[in-house]
C-alpha cells in the first residue's frame, strides 16, 4: 500500500530525458530497433520521439535505465525491460523537426500470447495499465463494405509513390502507382511490391502535395489478376 501511495504521488509526468531502446516487430520476419530519449515518464507510461512510424495499439518493447522508485513491474535489474502499448502518435511536421511524437502505457514484462504469431495486431486497454488487453477489431474488408457515412470511400485514381524502408530506415523499394479507391482514413492501391501485412509504408502524392505513413491491413488480388494492398493512414487523414 505504501508503494501504491508513492506511485500516486509521482503519477504526474516527470521530464526525465533518459535514453531508451525501442524494439518493434512489424511482422513475424521484420523488426527494427531505435535508440532515442524519453521526453517524460511516469510509473505507468512515457513519451518520446521516433524517426520511424508506428500506430496506436501496437506493442513496443522498451529498455530504460529507469529509477527503481518509478518502476511497477521490476525493481531488481539495472535496466527496466518493459512492454508498452502505443496510446498516442503525432507526426512532427514543423521544420527542422521530423519523425513522430509517441505516448505509451506500460503493460508488463511479457507480451500477450497472440503477439508471438501476429506481432502486427493492435490492442487496447480500457482504463489503466493493470487492465486486460483486448485486440482491436482490425477487420478491413476492401470494396463496398468500406463505404460508411463517416468515411466515404471514393472510387478514384490518385497518384501515389509507395516507399518501403529497411531495418536501418533506408528506402529499399519504391513504386509509382495509383489508388483504386481512397477515403480520409485509408486506401486501396494497385502494387507489384511484395510487402507483408503489418508493415508500414510511406505514400506520397504529388497531385495532393501530401505525404503520409500507412499500415498495411490486408492484401488481395482482383478479378483482373492485379494485386492490391489495403492500407490505413496512421499519422494523418487524407485531405479529400
Enumerate the language-model features and the residues they cover.
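Structured alpha-helical
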Residues: 1-240
Amino acid at each position: 500500500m505504501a508503494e501504491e501511495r508513492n506511485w500516486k504521488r509521482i503519477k504526474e509526468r516527470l521530464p526525465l530525458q533518459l535514453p531508451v531502446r525501442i524494439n518493434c516487430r512489424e511482422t513475424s520476419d521484420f523488426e527494427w530497433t531505435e535508440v532515442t530519449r524519453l521526453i517524460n515518464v511516469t510509473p505507468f507510461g512515457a513519451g518520446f520521439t521516433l524517426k520511424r512510424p508506428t500506430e496506436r495499439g501496437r506493442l513496443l518493447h522498451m529498455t530504460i535505465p529507469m529509477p527503481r522508485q518509478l518502476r511497477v513491474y521490476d525493481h531488481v535489474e539495472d535496466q527496466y525491460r518493459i512492454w508498452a502499448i502505443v496510446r498516442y502518435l503525432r507526426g512532427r511536421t514543423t521544420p527542422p523537426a521530423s519523425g513522430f511524437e509517441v505516448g505509451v502505457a506500460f503493460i508488463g514484462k511479457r507480451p500477450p500470447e497472440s503477439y508471438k504469431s501476429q506481432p502486427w495486431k493492435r490492442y487496447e486497454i480500457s482504463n489503466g495499465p493493470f487492465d486486460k488487453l483486448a485486440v482491436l477489431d482490425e477487420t478491413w474488408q476492401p470494396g463496398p463494405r468500406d463505404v460508411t457515412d463517416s468515411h466515404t470511400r471514393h472510387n478514384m485514381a490518385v497518384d501515389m509513390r509507395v516507399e518501403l524502408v529497411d531495418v536501418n530506415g533506408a528506402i529499399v523499394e519504391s513504386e509509382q502507382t495509383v489508388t483504386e479507391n481512397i477515403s480520409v482514413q485509408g486506401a486501396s492501391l494497385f502494387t507489384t511490391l511484395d510487402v507483408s501485412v503489418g508493415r508500414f509504408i510511406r505514400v506520397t502524392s504529388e497531385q495532393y502535395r501530401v505525404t503520409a505513413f500507412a499500415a498495411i491491413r490486408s492484401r488481395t488480388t482482383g478479378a483482373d489478376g492485379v494485386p492490391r494492398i489495403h492500407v490505413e493512414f496512421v499519422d494523418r487523414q487524407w485531405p479529400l
